[in-house]
């Protein structure tokens, strides 16, 4: 890490999260923007990264060449798409640098590819990079463990903006995994994603998901534990994308001196022992 701070690459630089990352890196001591990458053919390629993020010129031109961007970098922050993130994971592994992945909608097969890349890269991957959500996941696991499945039903409700393309959200699935871990069950077997028509009575021990989409909602998540005559709700509301950008930058700096491996935000925040 140089005297000006950890050299970070932002991929997906033209998107909402990419622009938020550029702004926050510019404001955060201990890190610096090394390069910014947008997809080939993007109208933003060749433009100044600071200008598109509302900072004014900062002297870093957006490129569509990740190989060149990763050269001499120390970390990459990635909120793109599953296929694109897997490509970047391979490049990060070749470069032996940190790769922070906030991309959602990844399949189990995608996860295996990330883990393979982590043999050479320090990969931090999470469905949500915020401190609050990761604390919520720990509390969800503890509550699921304490409240027995026969008497307490778990439902996970999430809402996001109308442009989000995957459902349930990565955060909802993260919370579902936490609930399943507390109950010592497999989420794939226990989850109920769709209810329509005559569904019959709710099966004890299942973990339900409900998805809402609309407007400009950044992210709202609630885990509901419903018992006879009482209900416990654990909720998180995101008011600004900067919470995810801030968490991703924190993760990159944390991973700088770590061994190659596959890490989560619980590791970054020192909460993994609570799993």
UniProtKB/Swiss-Prot annotation:
EC number: 1.17.1.8
CDD domains: DHDPR_N
Family: Belongs to the DapB family.
Name by which UniProt lists this protein: 4-hydroxy-tetrahydrodipicolinate reductase
Residue spans crossing the bilayer: none
Residues annotated for NAD(+) binding in this entry: 12-17, 102-104, 126-129
Function as written in the Swiss-Prot or TrEMBL entry: Catalyzes the conversion of 4-hydroxy-tetrahydrodipicolinate (HTPA) to tetrahydrodipicolinate.
Pathway where this protein functions: Amino-acid biosynthesis; L-lysine biosynthesis via DAP pathway; (S)-tetrahydrodipicolinate from L-aspartate: step 4/4
InterPro entries, A to Z: DapB_C (IPR022663), DapB_N (IPR000846), DapB_N_CS (IPR022664), DHDPR_bac (IPR023940), NAD(P)-bd_dom_sf (IPR036291)
Origin organism lineage: Bacteria, Pseudomonadati, Pseudomonadota, Alphaproteobacteria, Hyphomicrobiales
GO biological process: diaminopimelate biosynthetic process; lysine biosynthetic process via diaminopimelate
HAMAP family in UniProt: DapB
Enzymatic reactions: (S)-2,3,4,5-tetrahydrodipicolinate + NAD(+) + H2O = (2S,4S)-4-hydroxy-2,3,4,5-tetrahydrodipicolinate + NADH + H(+); (S)-2,3,4,5-tetrahydrodipicolinate + NADP(+) + H2O = (2S,4S)-4-hydroxy-2,3,4,5-tetrahydrodipicolinate + NADPH + H(+)
Enzymatic class: oxidoreductase
Recorded superkingdom: Bacteria
Keywords from the named record: Amino-acid biosynthesis, Cytoplasm, Diaminopimelate biosynthesis, Lysine biosynthesis, NAD, NADP, Oxidoreductase
Main location: cytoplasm
């Amino acid at each position: 890490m140089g005297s000006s701070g950890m050299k970070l690459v932002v991929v997906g630089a033209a998107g909402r999260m990419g622009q938020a990352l550029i702004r926050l890196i510019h404001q955060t001591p201990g890190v610096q923007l090394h390069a910014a990458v947008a997809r080939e053919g993007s109208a933003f390629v060749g433009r100044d990264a600071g200008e598109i993020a509302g900072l004014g010129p900062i002297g870093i031109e957006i490129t569509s060449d990740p190989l060149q961007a990763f050269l001499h970098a120390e970390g990459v922050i990635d909120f793109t798409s599953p296929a694109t993130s897997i490509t970047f994971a391979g490049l990060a592994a070749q470069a032996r640098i940190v790769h922070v992945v906030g991309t959602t909608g990844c399949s189990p097969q995608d996860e295996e590819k990330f883990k393979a890349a982590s043999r050479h890269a320090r990969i931090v991957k999470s469905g949500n990079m915020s401190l609050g959500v990761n604390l919520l996941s720990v509390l969800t696991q503890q509550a699921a463990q304490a409240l027995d499945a026969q008497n307490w039903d778990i439902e996970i409700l999430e809402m996001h903006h109308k442009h989000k393309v995957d459902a349930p959200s990565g955060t909802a699935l993260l919370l579902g995994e936490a609930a399943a871990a507390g109950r010592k069950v497999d989420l794939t077997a226990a989850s109920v994603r769709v209810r329509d028509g005559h569904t019959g009575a709710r099966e004890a021990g299942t973990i339900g998901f409900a998805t809402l989409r609309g407007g400009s909602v950044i992210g709202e998540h609630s885990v509901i534990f419903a018992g006879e005559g009482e209900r416990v709700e654990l909720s998180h509301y995101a008011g600004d994308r900067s919470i995810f950008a801030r968490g991703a930058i924190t993760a990159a700096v944390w991973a700088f001196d770590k061994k190659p491996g596959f890490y989560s935000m619980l590791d970054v925040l020192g909460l993994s022992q609570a799993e």
